């Protein structure tokens, strides 16, 4: 059962940014998760609430709208948790990519929505051509490229369109808002090298909160969003 409530045992969970706009989106996500079992229909139903958050001004703190030169993501990319369900079933975060910088090619492993709050991004989406049995290699081809402007967003329904990278094409850093059905920066996902076909496990981490380290777990590489 998803934990969208307010009783959390650690300050790194729950509403890290507690504003009416964020609470409204999380409440609507909780309602639709209860009432709409079909993932595609649920994501579609979330579009109005997500669009409202993207169009609202003043709710994102300046501290979570800046590049992070010390981030394990590299490239000055900041990834800031805004809300995290204690059971790992949902997160909301901002991704700040400096002008001209880009993320590695990566996946998300969760349904959700991603939209641009400030600036402009180019997204390149990949299609996987192999059957995925070899965890260390993948054959990818570009499925599409498009520009995402402020207020525009797209959906994730893995495995469809789950592998991509984004690049800031505005003169100032871009900020995208991500609502995803896992604890994205703390789960082990995949980073891809389309040229060589190499796939590597990675965990991007947040810039403002720490991921819990399971006992005896190996540390994974950083990068992605």
Q: For the regions a protein language model found, what residue spans apply to each?
A:
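A short hydrophobic beta-strand segment most commonly corresponding to one strand
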Residues: 113-115, 171-186
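Ligand-binding loop in jelly-roll beta-barrel domains
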Residues: 158-177
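Glycine- and acidic-residue-biased ligand/ion/polar-headgroup-sensing regions
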Residues: 110-129
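Long hydrophobic alpha-helical segments typical of transmembrane helices together
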Residues: 192-225
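A short glycine-rich, His/Asp/Glu-containing loop-to-beta-strand
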Residues: 73-99, 153
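Short acidic-glycine-tyrosine-enriched beta hairpin
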Residues: 128-163, 205
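N-terminal leader/capping segments at the start of a protein or of a new domain
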Residues: 1-58
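Conserved short histidine dyad/triad with adjacent acidic residue
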Residues: 93-107, 157-161
């Amino acid at each position: 059962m998803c934990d969208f409530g307010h009783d959390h045992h650690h300050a790194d969970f729950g509403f890290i940014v507690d504003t009416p706009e964020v609470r409204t989106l999380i409440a609507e996500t909780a309602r639709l998760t209860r009432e709409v079992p079909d993932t595609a229909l649920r994501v579609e139903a979330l579009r109005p609430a997500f669009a409202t958050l993207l169009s609202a001004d003043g709710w994102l703190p300046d501290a979570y709208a800046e590049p992070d030169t010390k981030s394990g993501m590299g490239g000055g990319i900041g990834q800031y948790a805004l809300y995290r369900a204690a059971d790992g079933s949902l997160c909301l975060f901002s991704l700040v990519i400096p002008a001209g910088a880009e993320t590695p090619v990566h996946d998300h492993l969760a349904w959700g929505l991603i939209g641009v709050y400030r600036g402009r991004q180019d997204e390149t989406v990949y299609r996987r051509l192999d059957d995925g049995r070899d965890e260390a290699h993948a054959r990818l081809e570009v499925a599409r490229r498009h520009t995402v402007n402020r207020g525009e967003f797209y959906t994730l329904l893995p495995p469809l369109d789950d592998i991509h990278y984004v690049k800031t094409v505005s003169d100032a850093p871009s900020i995208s808002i991500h609502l995803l059905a896992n604890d994205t920066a703390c789960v082990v996902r995949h980073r891809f090298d389309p040229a060589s076909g190499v796939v590597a496990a990675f965990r991007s981490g947040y810039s403002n909160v720490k991921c819990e380290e399971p006992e005896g777990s190996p540390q994974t590489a950083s990068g992605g969003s």
